[in-house]
Amino acid sequence: MSSVGFEPDVQQKQHGGITGGFSLKYTCEKYFKTICSIYAEVNYAQVGWKEDILDIDNKPVIITDTKQAMAYSRTINYIQVPVFAHLAWGREERGLNIFVNAGPQFGFYLSDSKDTNFDVKNMPKTDNDRVSPVVAQDTMAIKNKLDYGIALGLGAEYSIPKVGHFLAEARYYYGLGNIYGASKRDYFGKSNYGQIVLKLSYLFDITRTKNVRRK
């Protein structure tokens, strides 16, 4: 689920999309009870925004000709590369541990698409007026093709010897970059992503070092 923090504000609902790819974890050492690792991913991700087009009474704006509620969403496809410090507490080799992921994330733009029921360049006649006059985002092309920000995740890992590691995680990403220009000459002062990701992962051991302290 994702949205874009526009300034001036654009009313939105959460935009749904898929995130999936490959993960790699390198366990460095165990300090006291903390298992310290480096965790990286290469993911294909669909992010964007879904507009909540309402009138002054918080009711959907109805297109006169079709009698449909106005709808607009933009899906933007990225290759996302997060690199995390992975700190875990609990069992490393067999059983359950709880972990925290934190670190930077980079996104490389692939493409984008619109899903709408009206002509964004020629606004239709409506039965009621939309409360927000901000519509520039509907026709603007994505300017900045590199996205970057920070992510924080909380999850659990269950390990079974000779089978692998099963991970479940909830993660939040806050974009530090903007998808549109943000200078004084640009329309938007801010246009950064906020993304909530729920992930299930499976990891298997490629190589292991002998360590009698592991449990």
Task: List each model region and its residues.
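Residues on the lipid-exposed face of transmembrane beta-strands in outer-membrane beta-barrel proteins
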Residues: 20-28, 44, 81-87, 102-106, ...
